[in-house]
Amino acid sequence: MARKSIVTIAEFSIHPIGSGVSVSREVRAAIRSISRIRGLKYQVTPMATVLESPDLAKILKAVEVSHATLRKLGSMRISSTLRIDERLDKPRSMADKVRSARG
């Protein structure tokens, strides 16, 4: 039987291609769509959004709704990156990882 992750943390960024130099409107809309997902915590950073959930499916849903949002805004090409840290041995939140790194 597969072990269920205690918490999954992911770094996600999305970039509409061909929409000009500033993409803040599109990124803001994507973040708004992510904020509606129950059971998903997020932290916006200057270069990406960090996602946290005990359910990997919620993180993948955030990617899906972000792409759908940008398509609705007229983006004809979308590039995104997703880096996932799924820890199974003990619970670690975004805040725990930051505290650990700072010492």
Give the predicted meaning of each segment.
Residues A2-G103:
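Charge-rich, low-complexity N-terminal segments
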